[in-house]
């Protein structure tokens, strides 16, 4: 449906089950027809990641250009790009200013891949994303490929995007490459909220330790960017204190630039 058709597509699939491959198939179809593809990534950090990851398109003679608020826009490069990578907010801004020569490139997009389309349901950013997609459809009527790991209302999204049933896919947990096991752990709660954060972090590290020792990875969610930086620093110290080897993955840098993390 993605490579051989032109219909809009909505796909929901578990994390790491191949959504990036679906995006790349849509891009390949667009490039095959000499079109311009736009990939809308939810965060600036992911736009940088895609730029590095899609070097292989450059090797095939196609140009990839990232447009974000933290970079100086080169309108000529944007106009000549085969693949554009942008955040929802920057795409929103470009579509609002499409009449200006600086942002006229946005009206030449033939295919839009929306990553993490479930953000439509979020406060603030959801409204921006919805308005941006609607504006794009009015400006240049591109093919829309909407991807998400969690989309409970996939039929509603498909209906809004005019994606037919044969181009609407919902893959269950059986497609997850790694089994997901759920568990609830408790920790002792004290009177000091600051100390409680570290109690929770140590409990999380206790769970993660055996996986890290086997050269695995762990992802710890905290409530804010500031807490993320503190937890990362404390985790590094605690892991060193526990003598857990981590050198196999190379250097460990903290990406603490607010623009990079937003």
Provide a role label for each language-model segment.
Residues 39, 48-51, 55, 59-65, ...:
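Conserved C-terminal RecA-like helicase domain
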Residues 20-21, 35-56, 90-92, 149-154, ...:
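Conserved Walker A/P-loop ATP-binding site and its immediately adjacent core
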